[in-house]
Amino acid sequence: MLTERQLLIFRAIIDHFTWTIQPVGSKNLLKEKSLPYSSATIRNEMGVLEEYGFIEKTHSSSGRVPSEKGYRFYVDYLLQPKKLDKSDRQMIRSFFSENYYEMEGLIQNSALMLSDLTNYTSILLGPEATKNHLSGFRFVPINNFQAMLILITDQGHVDNHLVTIPEGTTLSDIERMVNILNERLVGLSLDDLKVQIPMEVKELLGKHVRNYESFMHVFSDSFAQASQQKVYFGGKTNILNQPEFHDINKVREMLHLMEEEQDVYELFRDIPDGLQVKIGRENNNSLMEDCSIITATYNIAGERVGGIVLLGPTRMEYSRMMGLVDVMSRDLTDVLTKLYRDNQN
């Protein structure tokens, strides 16, 4: 579609805008990139690129910038995920060589590391909680009025809930209740727990535990919270530091979105397998018209369980960012699978 000369000039425009965020004309492009063409030739070829819709003129300058269509062509046909440089690879290798004993901390720290490497906002979608199976739980009294309810799933997820101990409850009541629940509920999915607690467990608790009605509310609320989908952020406000976000209303709306974790989960829950890039208006969200999103999924023991989202400006350094997300997906899969298998033994 494009000649070698047009491709070279187009790449130079992309590279210029990635690092300067400024429109560029033929004279500056020639001076900056030392292209082997005259200014007139570059100007003519830029005219062709504009006719194709790959670059466009801004309102405030006579120079040109890449368009969404141009970025789409660039990502689809002109680049591959970049092989990580030594410092990136070393940081990731060092991170994943640590010993991790629970899934939640590993995923959260992965989100933080990805944002540190990119200076963009990273979002990791946790495994679908309702498919997790209960491995066991503990009820640890803190004082006469409060206790910590600790739920552990088969995928290494640990959920802690500070709960109020119902009035008149004794330690022996708590011990009996924990034994009953562990006996009846271990191995069930969190989704099934919603059914089992009000049906079978309620009757058992009524026979063996005083004031069991209050316990029912405590456990029902805790299991409901544990069933919520988990979203882990790294650099939540990094995207707002980009020059594209100078509109205070857009900043406010984006901050509000980031605070609604379940909305964020629904926004990205259906990301496809493999490394994917959505650019600008392809995101079908007015808040993200100036953003590009790179996504990948991660697995545990061959089963897809979560997603990785990197949110940055449309002028991002795509090859490096795609390389980082791709490596993160594969390495996180390996470590989570090992953690899962260790927990099965």
Curated annotation (Swiss-Prot):
InterPro entries: GAF-like_dom_sf (IPR029016), HrcA (IPR002571), HrcA_C (IPR021153), WH-like_DNA-bd_sf (IPR036388), WH_DNA-bd_sf (IPR036390), WHTH_transcript_rep_HrcA_IDD (IPR023120). One of its GO terms (biological process) is negative regulation of DNA-templated transcription. It comes from the Bacteria. Keywords: Repressor, Stress response, Transcription, Transcription regulation. One of its GO terms (molecular function) is DNA binding. It holds the Pfam family HrcA. Negative regulator of class I heat shock genes (grpE-dnaK-dnaJ and groELS operons). Prevents heat-shock induction of these operons. Belongs to the HrcA family. This is Heat-inducible transcription repressor HrcA.
